[in-house]
Curated annotation (Swiss-Prot):
This is Glycerol-3-phosphate dehydrogenase [NAD(+)] 1. It comes from Yarrowia lipolytica (strain CLIB 122 / E 150) (Yeast). GO terms for biological process: carbohydrate metabolic process; glycerol-3-phosphate catabolic process; glycerol-3-phosphate metabolic process. Belongs to the NAD-dependent glycerol-3-phosphate dehydrogenase family. One of its GO terms (cellular component) is nucleus. Keywords: Cytoplasm, NAD, Oxidoreductase. Its EC number is 1.1.1.8. It is found in: Cytoplasm. The active site is at 253 (proton acceptor). Gene3D superfamilies: N-(1-d-carboxylethyl)-l-norvaline Dehydrogenase, domain 2, NAD(P)-binding Rossmann-like Domain.
Length: 398
């Protein structure tokens, strides 16, 4: 890369941060000194809820940027860690003493300003940016605990990949957070294999955030603030406004990745996997049009949160690995849950949960025939179909 291009890219990112810094200086100079300003504190305090493989990776990024931008962020970042024992010791004690999440992100050193906190309410105390990053089956319980205990002017970002499906319909997880806690919520999603990012290998992500109705002007969270919070030299951020599109891409690609894993496990080759990915993208777009018509289809076909996430998830993500192992064990009597336990060190493949939820939604709406790949994936998981049935089913798809 030429020196001129490096300079241009650096300027593009830094201009947003510099613009923020200048705005905050003007705000501080023109407004009466608040207690925070008098104490010399930065305007944003950040907390992370969730400390699995991906949660810890994002917390690492956030902590690095809180150190890099002291004019914007308070240096200490608390991450909520569900307490458990590791070799007889509390995980949080090991985390804070060794600066490593030995359970879910071993051998990755974490910033010293990242503090593990087992008490959820203490972890988010005083925070005005809260990053949610935990398995989505635990989200409702966490939101109930937080309700009434967070600053109503705080903002949230969801890094979860899934949907909330009820008999009444389907909802974005960012909407669940907003409805349950009152926090205006955006999303972060993309072609983001956690281990690669933790090792600081180059990747991209997409952040979707819309200005809240109660936006209070200078000092509130904006896309520039979020870019400063998440962008790293190895983790490049693109900001868009399509919260629905980014959310759907992150959720449904997990179902497609399971199915791609099935055919990989059967050794059908790359052509077969590409066919699954193509059909999967079509059904992701169809799903978006049916249930979230506000989605910008370009998000799925252009952004990291769409096609790029689908590609990487079907090449090496945990859902793909679970699907591949299940495909190899086809006919052995092992369930998908057995495979999860063997492969994921106590964590879950979100695609299995999402697949079940999408099936229930399509069944309730009498739309099963319109989504043959999603439905076939569900049927294979539950033993109602064989992987060998896939080519014939997809051949007759619209």
């Amino acid at each position: 890369m030429s020196a001129l291009l490096r300079s241009s890219l650096r300027f593009k990112h830094m201009s947003a941060v510099n613009r923020l810094t200048q705005q905050l200086r003007l705000l501080t100079a023109s407004a009466p000194l608040s207690a925070a300003n008098t104490a010399g504190k930065a305007p944003f305090k950040v907390a992370v809820v969730g400390s699995g493989n991906w949660g810890t990776t994002v917390a690492k990024i956030v902590a690095e940027n809180c150190t890099a931008h002291p004019e914007l962020f308070e240096p200490e970042v608390r991450v909520w860690v569900r307490e458990e024992k590791v070799n007889g010791k509390n995980l949080t004690d090991i985390f804070n003493a060794e600066h490593e999440n030995v359970r879910y992100l071993p051998k990755i050193k974490l910033p010293h300003n990242l503090i593990a906190e087992p008490d959820l309410l203490k972890a988010v105390e005083g925070a005005n940016i809260i990053v949610f990053n935990l398995p989505h089956q635990f989200l409702a319980g966490v939101c109930k605990q937080l309700k009434g205990h967070v600053n109503p002017k705080a903002r949230a970002i969801s890094c979860l990949k899934g949907l909330d499906v009820t008999p009444q319909g389907v909802y974005l997880l960012s909407d669940v957070i907003e409805n349950e806690t009152g926090l205006h919520c955006g999303v972060l999603s993309g072609a983001n294999l956690a281990t690669e990012i933790a090792l600081e290998k180059y990747s991209e992500t997409t952040v979707a955030y819309n200005r809240p109705k109660d936006f209070f002007g200078e000092g509130d969270v904006t896309n520039d603030v979020l870019k400063a919070l998440f962008h790293r030299p190895y983790f490049h951020v693109r900001c868009v406004q399509d919260v629905a599109g980014v959310s759907i891409g992150g959720a449904l690609k997990n179902v497609v990745a399971l199915c791609a894993g099935f055919v990989e496990g059967k050794n059908w080759g790359d052509n077969a996997k590409a066919a699954i990915m193509r059909r999967g993208m079509l059904e992701m777009i169809n799903f978006s049009k049916r249930f979230f018509p506000e989605t910008d289809i370009n998000t799925l076909t252009v952004e990291s949160a769409g096609v790029a996430d689908l590609i990487t998830s079907c090449a090496g993500g945990r859902n793909f690995k679970v699907g591949r192992a299940f495909g190899k064990e086809s006919g052995s009597g092992k369930t998908i849950q057995d495979v999860e336990k063997e492969l994921l060190n106590g964590q879950s493949a979100q695609g299995v949960i999402t697949c079940n939820e999408v099936h229930e939604l399509l069944k309730n709406k009498n739309m099963q025939k319109d989504f043959p790949l999603f439905e076939s994936t569900w049927g294979i998981i539950h033993g109602e179909l064989k992987i060998d049935d896939l080519p014939e089913i997809l051949y007759h798809a619209n």
